[in-house]
Amino acid sequence: VVLVLVAVAIGAELYTRHLASSKVASAVQCEIQDSASVSFAPSPPVLWQYLNSHYTDISVQTAGNQVRSAKGMKVNLDIRDIKLSDTSNSRGTIGSLNGTITWSADGIKQSIQDAVPVLGKFVTGEVTTNPGDGTVQLKGLLDSATVKPQIVNNGLSLQVVSLSALGSKMSTTSVQQHLDELTSKATQNYPLGIHADSVKVTSTGVEATFSTSNATIPADSGGSTGGSQDTCFSNV
């Protein structure tokens, strides 16, 4: 009898862990548009957290393929103190969410080539990161641009520092507009009040931190479709 009870408890724990992981992963995948893996703190058991509608610590890691339209972006999240309680306009609350987005140099190159074709000539060569002065250099056959990652409108932005467009009519303003369109789509307007806190250039790319606290999980709006804060997290 004891063995049966133990087996049932283990089975219930594994099932609940799988169910909870699937829901969190689906919400993140919906918003980020990349696959995600989820893990829970070793204690208390996920079954206990499920029965109490209170999850203490959840970690999420995306595959690193992309964040929305930005290629080569990877997200790591630490989500704490999730309390689920249905009301007419809320599924519950999140005590805190802290995340890191890493954007590889190759990802920056591919993103600009794919999402902003008119700027493709600026990155036909290599993308070089310079942690010392916090800049990224985009090199083409004749053209080049130096950009500096900054926080703008609660998201990540690549601000043009210098531009060398030999034989081109493109201006700094035009290049900046195209870069802003790329980065704003990828890193702005996140749900739950998630916003960028800091950004730095590393030897391999760009790293930005994001966070939110005391956030309300929105209820299902009933009519909208994926990619909005009303639907991606409403089924958590």
Predicted regions and their residues:
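Solvent-exposed coil/turn segments that connect beta secondary-structure elements
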Residues: S43, A63-N65, R80-I82, L141-D143, ...
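Soluble extracytoplasmic domains of inner/organellar membrane proteins
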Residues: T102-Q176, D180-S184
